[in-house]
């Protein structure tokens, strides 16, 4: 497998890995940090911002080992794929969805779908845990619809029941 293909595979595999990590860590023992993301923002930075720092350090370690091993080490393209996923997540999640930096709203089907899925996650503190290809469980979509909530326009991070449901 070429390095480019390996990097692309790593990028794609990161979506289910991220979903599992989000469910197990962010909404598990890491909820102390992650809770700040489900509450109204009080500062430019939130405790939840420590997660990408920790994950970036892990990726830097993988890339460093790949460079140290040299030769045909698969760690470098894997590290590049993981880094590409992390950069995509940062731009889509923090910039486009949460608008933590000035950025125009994205008005297309993909942006609409990503915002709607992420809003459901913030509303109920449950799935979808993935991000670039989220699947909203039917029961949660129906629950939001039954409450008359426009899942695409909800202000993210202000739901009163965001982590209690």
Residue ranges and their predicted role:
Residues 1-165:
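Hydrophobic transmembrane helical bundles of multi-pass organellar membrane proteins
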């Amino acid at each position: 497998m070429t390095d480019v293909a390996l990097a692309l595979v790593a990028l794609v595999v990161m979506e289910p890995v991220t979903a599992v990590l989000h469910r197990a860590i962010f909404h598990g023992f890491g909820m102390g940090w992650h809770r700040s993301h489900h509450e109204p923002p009080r500062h430019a930075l939130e405790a939840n911002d420590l997660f990408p720092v920790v994950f970036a350090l892990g990726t830097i370690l993988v890339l460093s080992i790949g460079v140290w091993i040299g030769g045909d080490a698969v760690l470098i393209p894997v590290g590049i794929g993981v880094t590409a996923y992390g950069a995509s997540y940062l731009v889509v999640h923090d910039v486009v969805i949460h608008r933590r930096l000035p950025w125009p709203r994205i008005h297309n089907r993909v942006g609409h779908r990503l915002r709607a899925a992420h809003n459901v996650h913030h509303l109920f503190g449950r799935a979808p845990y993935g991000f670039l290809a989220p699947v909203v469980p039917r029961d949660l979509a129906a629950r939001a619809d039954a409450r008359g909530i426009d899942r695409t326009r909800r202000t993210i991070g202000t739901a009163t029941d965001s982590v209690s449901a």
